[in-house]
């Protein structure tokens, strides 16, 4: 089963109050759905990778559990404790920020330090166990980004917060996450602008180079034809 996650970005006209309001509303709606729950199948030596766009200084929590296909029952059963998953996370600069072996069910966490596309890869350690024996493994994965990664029930119990205090804390963290998302969108716009300017500059220089090459070829052809006609005494 192939699963593709995407985000639709609507860009209002800049410089208008309505555009700023719409952008804020879109960010709020997007933040409300930043949890990504899915499942996928992997083979014995297969690796699955996912791309998640994450702002900087944002916590990400991934929960997973594995199921092994039982050929006799023809259904997926909970995997044995000996079957583990290796999780590797790379930042947009391709630096490894997490690489660790986990069990058949577990949780991994990391905090982004660079905004952009983070690569999350999982594969099993099944080559060490004959119980897998070329079968298929089903992995249920749930990724929570930003304030959605917080367990507010646990926070309230730990810090002894009232319902009002907890709600205020949730709102504060939501506002902070919105600010991070806005900063990330501005960073993306700046990168896009730089890429566009660089591309336009290259196109301009390539056009100038093509023009110079054509002029040089034209001059060379005229001189060559003149020499040819003079050699044939036609001029």
Swiss-Prot record:
Glycans are attached at residue 125. One of its GO terms (cellular component) is Golgi apparatus. A motif (COPII vesicle coat-binding) lies at residues 228-229. Residues 47-145 form the GOLD domain. SMART domains: EMP24_GP25L. It is found in: Endoplasmic reticulum membrane; Golgi apparatus, cis-Golgi network membrane; Endoplasmic reticulum-Golgi intermediate compartment membrane; Golgi apparatus, trans-Golgi network membrane. The modification N6-acetyllysine is found at residue 160. Residues 38-202 are lumenal. Residues 1-37 form the signal peptide. It is a single-pass type I membrane protein. Residues 154-184 form a coiled coil. Residues 121-160 are annotated as: Required for interaction with STX17. Residues 223-235 are cytoplasmic. Its main location: endoplasmic reticulum. One of its GO terms (biological process) is intracellular protein transport. Keywords: Acetylation, Coiled coil, Endoplasmic reticulum, Glycoprotein, Golgi apparatus, Membrane, Protein transport, Signal, Transmembrane, Transmembrane helix, Transport. InterPro entries: Emp24-like (IPR015720), GOLD_dom (IPR009038). GO terms for molecular function: syntaxin binding. A motif (COPI vesicle coat-binding) lies at residues 228-235. N-linked glycosylated containing high mannose. The chain crosses the membrane at residues 203-222. Appears to be involved in vesicular protein trafficking, mainly in the early secretory pathway. In COPI vesicle-mediated retrograde transport involved in the coatomer recruitment to membranes of the early secretory pathway. Increases coatomer-dependent activity of ARFGAP2. Thought to play a crucial role in the specific retention of p24 complexes in cis-Golgi membranes; specifically contributes to the coupled localization of TMED2 and TMED10 in the cis-Golgi network. Monomer and homodimer in endoplasmic reticulum. Predominantly monomeric and to lesser extent homodimeric in endoplasmic reticulum-Golgi intermediate compartment and cis-Golgi network. Probably oligomerizes with other members of the EMP24/GP25L family such as TMED2, TMED7 and TMED10. Interacts with TMED5. Interacts (via C-terminus) with COPG1; the interaction involves dimeric TMED9. Interacts with PTPN2 and SPAST. Interacts with STX17; the interaction is direct. Belongs to the EMP24/GP25L family. This is Transmembrane emp24 domain-containing protein 9. It comes from Homo sapiens.
């Amino acid at each position: 089963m192939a699963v593709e996650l995407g985000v639709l970005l609507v860009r209002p006209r800049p410089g208008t109050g309505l555009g700023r309001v719409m952008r804020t509303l879109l960010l709020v709606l997007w933040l409300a759905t930043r949890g990504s729950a899915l499942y996928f199948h992997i083979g014995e030596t297969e690796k699955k990778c996912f791309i998640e766009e994450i702002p900087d200084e944002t916590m990400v929590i991934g929960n997973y559990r594995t199921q092994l296909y039982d050929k006799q029952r023809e259904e997926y059963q909970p995997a044995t404790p000996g079957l583990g998953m290796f999780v590797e996370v790379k930042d947009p600069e391709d630096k490894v920020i997490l690489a660790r072996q986990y069990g058949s069910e577990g949780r991994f966490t990391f905090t982004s330090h660079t905004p952009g596309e983070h690569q999350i890869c999982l594969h099993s350690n099944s080559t060490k166990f004959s119980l897998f024996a070329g079968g298929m493994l089903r992995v249920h994965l749930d990724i929570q980004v930003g304030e959605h990664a917080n367990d507010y029930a646990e926070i309230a119990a730990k810090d002894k917060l009232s319902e009002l205090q907890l709600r205020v804390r949730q709102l504060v963290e939501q506002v902070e996450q919105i600010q991070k998302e806005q900063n990330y969108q501005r960073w993306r716009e700046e990168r896009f602008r730089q890429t566009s300017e660089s591309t336009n500059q290259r196109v301009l220089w390539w056009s100038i180079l093509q023009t110079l090459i054509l002029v040089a070829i034209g001059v060379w052809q005229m001189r060559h034809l003149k020499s040819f006609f003079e050699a044939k005494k036609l001029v």
